[in-house]
Amino acid sequence: SNNIKILKNTLVTTYNFSDHLIALEDKNVGKPQDNEKPELVLHKIRTKHTILANGHIERFITFRNNDLPGVMLAASFEKYLNRYGVVPDESPVIFTNNSSTYSLLKSLTDLGHKPKAYVDIRDQKSIEKETVELLEKFNIPFYPKSEIEGCEGQKEVKKVSIRTKKNQISKIKTSMLCVSGGFNPDIHLFTQSK
C-alpha cells in the first residue's frame, strides 16, 4: 500500500498522546564499521492507529547471590543455543516456576547435553507430563516443589543450594544456573501513550 513505510533497524523511543511516536533509525547497520560518522535519523511519526507488538520480558526469581556470573535467564540461554549455535554450558541447573523451560530442556537433550538438575517451584502434579517424561528418560535429577536458596562462589557460580519440599538443603556443583520466573508483556511504550 502507498501509505505504509517500513523502517528497518529503527527503535521507537517515545509514544506520546494522540498516536505521536518518536523513532530512531540506524542507517549504519550492515555497513563497514569504519564509518566515521554514525548515520542516525530521528523520525516524528503521526498515525491514525498504532499497533504495538512488543513481545514479552522474562522475569527473574530472587535468591541469594543471583548476580554472580553464571546465572542467566533461561530464554537467553536457549537463544544462544538455538539461534547462534553457542552452548553457554553443557550441564546447567534449570530453575523455574513455569512450563517455558521445557523447550530449553528439549534443546539441550536433543544436542546430547544433560542438565545437572531441574528445580521447579510447582508440585509434580502441576508440571506438564512431557517435562516429567523427558526428565525421567534422561535420568535428570528432578526437584519438584523446591527452590534455589542461593548460589555459592566468589567470582562465578560454583554451587547452587536447593531447598527441597522437605525443607532440606541439597548442594550441586555447577557453573551455570538458568532461571525462568515466567513472562510479563512488554507494555512500556503503551503506558507512555496514556
Task: State where each predicted segment sits.
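Residues forming the flavin
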Residues: 1-194
